[in-house]
Amino acid sequence: MQKLKQQVFEANMDLPRYGLVTFTWGNVSAIDRERGLVVIKPSGVAYETMKADDMVVVDMSGKVVEGEYRPSSDTATHLELYRRYPSLGGIVHTHSTHATAWAQAGLAIPALGTTHADYFFGDIPCTRGLSEEEVQGEYELNTGKVIIETLGNAEPLHTPGIVVYQHGPFAWGKDAHDAVHNAVVMEEVAKMAWIARSINPQLNHIDSFLMNKHFMRKHGPNAYYGQK
């Protein structure tokens, strides 16, 4: 697990490097599907002092199997998403400014241009609010459940992120690095959408044919963007 712990540590350290977190407001995890184990950031540990060996290993029930610290308080959310979506290899949660602003506004981040379409096949959805019972009960687990409810039958790697109403963004990918990459993109397109709608409040969504072209040339069966 040492290699995966190092990868998760590096991915967590990318959050402050890319300006996605303040203090300890974020976490990254990754899963070893063969072993059924997840590596995740320890709860409340400052990035300035954190080391790879501080990463916490938990099983799919959330039991700590390796590590000196308690795992992130959002662990149950991560585990619920891993259980539901076998294609996920890494998950990120932050309170990045612009994506969180859309979450607090209760609005999906609209797909307005090709930067968005290169990564997200449509709007980045916003969940419904959790009920008082859901919050007072198994809050973090129910956060995962409301994300799954909102995604429905969507392919999660075609919609590699979401904003949870009144909370903040979650992003995911094929591994921890990919999940952080998608979290960075989500923050950037959230900022772009806010600016664009401020300039033109009547701005329409990106044309569907342009959306399809940009997403499929990177992610479709005949993708040709980048190097093989």
Swiss-Prot record:
Induction: Induced by L-ascorbate. Repressed by UlaR. SMART domains: Aldolase_II (SM01007). The active site is at D118, Y225. GO terms for biological process: L-ascorbic acid catabolic process; pentose catabolic process. Binds 1 zinc ion per subunit. It is an enzyme of class 5 (isomerase). One of its GO terms (molecular function) is L-ribulose-phosphate 4-epimerase activity. NCBIfam families: PRK08193.1, PRK12348.1. Belongs to the aldolase class II family. AraD/FucA subfamily. This is L-ribulose-5-phosphate 4-epimerase UlaF. It comes from Escherichia coli (strain 55989 / EAEC). The gene is ulaF.
